[in-house]
Amino acid sequence: MENIENVSPTLPQHPGITLCTLPIVAPGQEYRYMDQTKAYRQPRLGVQAIRDYLVGNNYPKECISFLDIEMLFPSDEELEEYFVTQAPDIVGLSAPLSHSYLQVKRVSNIIRSALPDSWIVLGGHLTASATVVLKKTVVDVCIVGDGEVPFCKFIEFVERGGSKNTISELETELGICYLDNEGELVFSGYSKKPPNESIPMPDYEFFKSGLLDKPELVDRYFIPVENLGAWYCFDPRAQEPHRNPFVAQFYTSKGCTARCTFCQRNTRGYRVTS
């Protein structure tokens, strides 16, 4: 008889996750007023915040990868090769502006072709138009509002065996949108802000990991002092001899102080965080 003491218990397998940033320009277009290969970028802290929240809730960091599509501008063939090789179970796309719609269509189609059974989840500003996104693209789920809590809830759903046939289990989860069997939008309301909300300091090693074989592009996260204009010089510390010629920027708030009637912001109001 087999000695059961020597049998290792079967542990639940964590799904592999790839988080991606998307360009705001349409496929095939160039930036009109800047060289896209040299333009300064602000780190997409929303993507990092999702990663940090998952890790803070005991999700293995090694199960999360990052692909900076916005910075790399890979071809369709390069994207397909990446996803076939990486083979994540869940791909999270970040669309910071509605301008990213055509990129969402492009990238999600490539993912669906390469990985027919994977989940494609969209977050960011574009999810204000979740009905259009879900009906006109192959995106499976939209995360509306602050994404940390609902994305974590979605991961838990997948970990316990949830499938596209049982997605109705998520109908009461705030911040999660999907289409039911009749093609109607299911949305129970905006997500709540994460507990102990904070905006992370940029993790440049994380952002560098998304640059694949072009780690030197991380330099584009640092803006030359001369590009800041006269405002920077108002601080006398800027004239200290030990100062380096580049500046890193980071966010200290969420939302916007404006109340434009035409804006579809998911983050309601203006919140200063730690």
Give names to the regions the model predicted.
Residues 35-54:
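Short catalytic helix/loop segments, enriched in acidic residues and glycine
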